[in-house]
């Protein structure tokens, strides 16, 4: 597991934990058969640099599996989702005394484009993108180097 926050690494159950950044991965070229990233991509300062780094550390034919959230594609569902996540994140933030963190989650969904747009690049072949969850706002994309 790689995370820039040591506290987050302490929470996970992976055996190998490294403090690091997805935009500057601390691994040699062609190191991994697969890279898995969950609910992080929309928070990167430079997602394009992150894609370049994942490509660099993957072996030829390696898979990049990305799980994250975005707004639904449909305009009406996107509006409902935006209203719903605003209210839910506000409530959870108030109840847990973490309003700043939960407001950030709501706002991060607005700045993140649809995966089909954001992840289209010359580095990877996209194998599939599957939308899940209510309104399809959670997605899983599998790409190959």
Predicted regions and their residues:
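A short acidic, Gly/Pro-enriched loop at the edge of an enzyme's catalytic core
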Residues: 23-35
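Core SAM-dependent methyltransferase catalytic element
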Residues: 120-145
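Class I SAM-dependent methyltransferase SAM/SAH-binding core
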Residues: 1-25
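C-terminal alpha-helical "lid/dimerization" subdomain adjacent to the S-adenosyl-L-methionine
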Residues: 2, 67-121, 130
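A short glycine-rich, Lys/Arg-flanked "PGG" loop and its adjoining helix->strand segment in the class I
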Residues: 48-63
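Short catalytic micro-motifs in class I SAM-dependent methyltransferases
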Residues: 39-42
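Short glycine/proline-enriched coil/turn segments at helix->beta-strand junctions
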Residues: 12-17, 60, 122-127
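A conserved beta-strand element that flanks and buttresses the S-adenosyl-L-methionine
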Residues: 36, 65
């Amino acid at each position: 597991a790689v995370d820039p926050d040591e506290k987050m690494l302490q929470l996970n159950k992976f055996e190998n934990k490294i403090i690091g950044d997805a935009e500057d991965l601390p691994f040699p070229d062609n190191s991994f058969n697969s890279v898995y990233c969950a609910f992080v991509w929309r928070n990167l300062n430079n997602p394009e640099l992150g894609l370049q780094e994942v490509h660099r550390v993957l072996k030829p034919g390696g898979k990049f599996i990305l799980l994250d959230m975005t707004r639904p594609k449909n305009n009406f569902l996107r509006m409902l989702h935006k209203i719903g996540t605003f209210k839910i994140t506000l409530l959870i933030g108030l109840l847990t005394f973490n309003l700043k963190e939960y407001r950030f989650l709501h706002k991060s969904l607005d700045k993140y484009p649809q995966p089909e747009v954001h992840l289209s690049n010359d580095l990877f072949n996209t194998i599939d993108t599957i939308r899940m969850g209510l309104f399809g706002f959670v997605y899983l994309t599998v790409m190959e180097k």
